[in-house]
Structure formats: C-alpha cells, structure tokens
C-alpha cells in the first residue's frame, strides 16, 4: 500500500514564534547603534535625492549646461536607486548586509565629497549614478538589520523613527537647502551627506554584528535575473521621468527606453519561471494582504507629491526661493517625532496598525481638500495649518503602513530566512521608489494638461474686440506709456501683463485640481485599508511570544 505524505503549512503563530525566537530579547548598546544607523541610512538617501532636485539650478549654473542636459541629473540618481533595489537582494545574499553597507557607505561619502568639485557634465552624471548605486543599498539592508536584530518590544519605536526620518527628510529638505545656500554655499547639498554618512558607518561597524557564513543553497543563485530586472526597472523609470520633457511617444529616446526596459523585465520573468532562484522564492507575495500593502505603499508615495510638488510649485510661480518655500513645507515635519512616539505606544497597546493607516490617509485627504481652496494671492503662511495637518496624516499613514508590512512579513513567512528578509525589503523598497517617482511623473503631467485646459477656457473670455479686454489693455497701456518707447510698446507690455495674469490663474486652478486628485487617491487608499485582513497578532502579542520563546530556551539550557 503506497504511503502518502501530507505537508502541513506552518500556522501564523508558529511562524511568529520562530521569528521571535531568532531575534534577541535584550537591547544592548550595539543594537542601539544599529537602530541609529538604520534611521540615518533611511534619511540620508531621501535627503540627498531632494537636495539634488532643489539644487538643480545651481548645478546647471556651476557646469554651464542647458535645461535639457540638467534634466538628466536627478533622473540619473533616481534611476540608479531603482536599479540597485532588486540587485541588493543578490549582493546581500552573496556577501552579507554588513559588508555591503560598509563598502557602499564609504564609497558614497567619498563621492558626495568630490561631486561639487567636478566641472565636467559627463563626469558629474557618472558620479551621480555611483552615488545612487551606493546609497540605494541603505534602504533594504538597514531595514533587514532592523527586522533581524531589534528586540520586538522596541520594534514599533524603530519602525516609527524609520518612517519619521524618511518622511521628515522630504519635508525638511527645502528649508535646509535654503539655509545652506543663504549662509554657506550650494556645495553643502552634497557635503551634508558626506558628513552624515561616516556617522552611519560607525553605527554599522559597532551596531551590526558580523553574520555567520550562510549555508550554501542547493541551487546556485544567478545574478543574471537580478541584473535584467534591475536594468529594466531603471530604464522604465528614466523613460517615465523624462516623458513629459521628451513629449512621450513622439520621442525616439522615450520609445527606446520603454521598449528596452520592458524587454529586460520580461526576460527576468521568463528566467525566473524557467529556473527558480533560491533568493527570490517568495510565496508570501501571492498573499492578499501583501498585494494590497504594495498598492497602498504606491498610493502613499503618490500622495506625498503634495509637499514635494504641489505646495512648492504653487509658491515658486510667484518667484519664491527655496528658503521662502521651506517654512511652508517644514510644518509637515514639525509634529513627526511626537506623532512617532504616540504611534509606537499605540502599537504596543494592541492597536490595529490598519487604524493608524486609515487615520493618516483621512487626515491627508482633509488637508488636501483644504489646500484646494488655493488662490493666486496665497503665500507660504497660508499653508501653515494645512501642512501641519498633512504632516500628522503622513506620519500616521506611513508608520501604520510600515508596521502592517512588517506584521505581514512575520505571519507570511517572509522573515523566516535571511534571504527572504532581503527580498521582502527590496520588494517594498522598489515599490516605494516607483510609487514616489511615478507619482511625481503622473502629477507633473496632470498639472501640465490641466493648465493647458484652464488656459484655453480662460482665454475664451479674453479676446480682442471684447470691451472689457480692450478697456483693460488701454488702461494698462496708459500706465505703462511713461516708461515705454512708444504707444505700441506700451500696448505690447500691457498684453504681456494680461497674459501673465491668465497664466497665473490657470496654473493656480491646475494646482487645485492636483490637490483634489491627491484627496481622491487618499480615498482609494482608505478602500484598500478596508479590504486588508486583520493580522492574527499585534505587536504586544509578539513581545509576549518572544519572552515565552526565550524562557523555553533558558529552561532547555
């Protein structure tokens, strides 16, 4: 009689117990330094990317390059971040997170130190790409350390601080860059990172333990699939980032980038199905909550464009500089530490992390609706209260999102093996990058199209021969005649003034439409939260499980 074998899948409680037993219970000095390294690594990458975007005009002036050439600088950095995200899984599994982080951090600090001294455009692009490749390892590898070495009672605080520093770096960058340019020099947009990174390196050296040699997998990991996927994602991102400037499908460069990137991604998928790779064996990706969390992370990154694009651009159209825009955006960062501490306490008090997400997205939607009352007379001070509410919403939403992602990793088996933790981190890291960058592309295209629409609609009411239009031109011409070379010059200047007013009003209306789009994206995210299944346990239960597992080990000893 033939015997049959039934393989029982581990329950969520068994997976949680195995994960808790593998994590140290006591918080020594080394994990404290490790937490600091995780936080600094998360913040410095985001801060550098924002600094490059804000200082693009200074970089172009430093090199003497055109607008089209300068547009590729930030694209090169972000494309490198997208490239290294999936490839970090292979590097981390091959050499270990600690070694990769130390090499990458050293290289990144040196590159940022010398970038302001470069006067060649091609060398600058190469240096920016190298900076993106080295700093792009910080996100997945530092989070990998946090998930494997931070005691579970302290994990909510680590998650809260991690989310706070990532979110805070976005909001504080305009004020910091404005202060650097006003009191020091624009070069500090890079030297800032070269000073912070060595501190992160010390935390990595003393805070991240040397990993033991991993068992050799039965199947040898292949780097080709990672290379195809990484290069494909990077090319697709570069195409989307430059699409508006290149006029989308009318450009051969855009078409070539999309076609080549799509082909490489398809090649990676074919290779994955034909020859499974031990480093990307991810059954948890097929789970309902994992899919919804990935989509939710995409929506959250899209909603961040309110502070990254909409608010700064609505002020920049009036001629505001970075140091004048900063006070409006920095209000989003003001409540972050307080909210992070409160959110961590709520998680330890058995609060469902989905409720934090829902509260955050609701606050962001309400703040976006308030910002949609924007008029052409608004200044930075008009954003203070709404951006404060936006900051509270962003903090709660991101902390709740990251906390739910970590719980999903615990109960789906994603954190049961070191290789799977790397894959888990890199998967959400890639979505985080694409969500933010693609979100910015979508919003930029949306605002541009809405501005054209509003310009055409407003132009229907401002036509030659209309008595209101003619009266306005004559009145402005009379006022400008004294400082013009003649009547025709005064009338041309008057037409230019009216055209500028129309453009300002059209742009203001398009920004309002952008705020409404963000509000609807928050509503869609709330629907995703409602569809998510509740985790079997919360963070308070995980702490108790870890204590029980430790007690059993001590009893056996």
Name what the model sees in each region.
Residues 18, 411-415, 427-557:
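Hydrophobic transmembrane architecture of multi-pass small-molecule transporters
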Residues 178-295:
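Hydrophobic transmembrane-helix bundles of small-molecule transporters
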Residues 85-226:
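Helix-loop-helix hairpins in multi-pass membrane proteins, especially solute transporters
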Residues 59-60, 91-92, 124, 176-184, ...:
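Interfacial helix-cap and linker-helix signal at transmembrane-aqueous boundaries
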Residues 31-47, 52-54, 67, 73-74, ...:
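12-transmembrane solute porter fold
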Residues 1-47, 61:
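Cytosolic juxtamembrane N-terminal segment immediately preceding the first transmembrane helix
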Residues 55-83, 123:
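Extracellular/periplasmic helix-loop-helix junction of adjacent transmembrane segments
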Residues 75-90, 139-143, 330-343:
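Central cavity-lining transmembrane alpha-helices of secondary-active solute carriers
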């Amino acid at each position: 009689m033939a015997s049959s074998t039934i393989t029982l899948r581990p329950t969520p409680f068994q997976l949680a117990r195995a994960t808790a037993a593998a994590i140290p219970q006591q918080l020594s000095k080394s994990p404290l330094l490790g937490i600091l390294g995780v936080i600094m690594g998360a913040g410095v990458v985001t801060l550098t990317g924002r600094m490059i975007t804000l200082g693009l005009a200074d970089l172009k002036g430093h090199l003497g390059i055109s607008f089209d050439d300068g547009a590729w600088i930030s694209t090169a950095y972000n494309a490198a971040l997208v490239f290294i995200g999936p490839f970090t899984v292979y590097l981390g599994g091959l050499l270990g997170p600690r070694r990769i982080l130390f090499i990458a951090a050293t290289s990144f600090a040196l590159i940022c130190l010398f970038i302001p001294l470069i006067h060649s455009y091609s060398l600058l692009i190469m240096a920016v790409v190298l900076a993106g490749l080295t700093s792009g390892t910080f996100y997945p590898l530092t989070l990998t350390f946090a998930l494997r070495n931070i005691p579970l009672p302290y994990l909510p605080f680590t998650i809260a601080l991690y989310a706070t520093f990532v979110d805070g770096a976005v909001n504080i960058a305009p004020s910091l860059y404005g202060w650097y340019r006003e009191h020091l020099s624009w070069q500090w947009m890079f030297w800032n990172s070269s000073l912070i990174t060595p501190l992160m390196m010390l935390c990595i050296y003393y805070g991240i333990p040397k990993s033991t040699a991993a068992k050799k997998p039965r199947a040898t990991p292949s780097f080709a699939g990672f290379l195809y996927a990484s290069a494909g994602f990077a090319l697709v991102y570069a195409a989307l980032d430059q699409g508006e400037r290149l006029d989308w499908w009318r450009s051969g460069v855009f078409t070539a980038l999309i076609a080549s990137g799509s082909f490489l991604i398809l090649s990676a998928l074919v290779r994955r199905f034909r020859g499974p790779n031990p480093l990307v064996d991810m059954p948890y990706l097929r789970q309902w909550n994992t899919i919804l969390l990935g989509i939710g992370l995409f929506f959250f990154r899209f909603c961040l464009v309110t502070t990254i694009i909409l608010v700064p651009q609505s002020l920049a159209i009036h001629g505001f500089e970075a140091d004048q825009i900063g006070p409006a955006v920095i209000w989003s960062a003001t409540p972050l530490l307080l909210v992070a501490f409160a959110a961590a306490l709520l998680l330890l008090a058995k609060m469902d992390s989905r409720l934090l997400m829902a509260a955050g997205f609701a606050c962001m939607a309400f703040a976006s609706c308030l910002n949609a009352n924007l008029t052409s007379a608004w200044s930075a001070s008009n954003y203070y209260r709404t951006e404060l509410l936006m900051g509270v919403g962003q903090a709660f939403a991101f902390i709740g999102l990251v906390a739910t992602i970590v719980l999903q990793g615990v109960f789906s088996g994603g954190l049961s093996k070191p290789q799977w933790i790397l894959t888990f981190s890199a998967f959400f890291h890639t979505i985080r990058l694409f969500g933010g960058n693609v979100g910015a592309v979508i919003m930029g295209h949306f605002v541009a199209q809405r501005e054209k629409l509003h310009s055409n609609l407003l132009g229907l009411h401002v036509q030659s021969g209309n008595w209101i239009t003619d009266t306005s031109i004559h009145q402005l011409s009379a006022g400008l005649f004294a400082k013009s070379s003649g009547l025709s010059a005064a009338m041309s200047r008057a037409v230019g003034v009216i055209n500028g007013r129309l453009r300002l009003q059209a742009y203001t209306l398009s920004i309002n439409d952008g705020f409404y789009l963000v509000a609807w994206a928050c509503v869609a995210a709330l629907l995703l939260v409602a569809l998510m299944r509740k985790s079997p346990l919360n963070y308070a239960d995980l702490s108790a499980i870890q204590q029980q597992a430790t007690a059993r080990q001590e009893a056996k000893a």
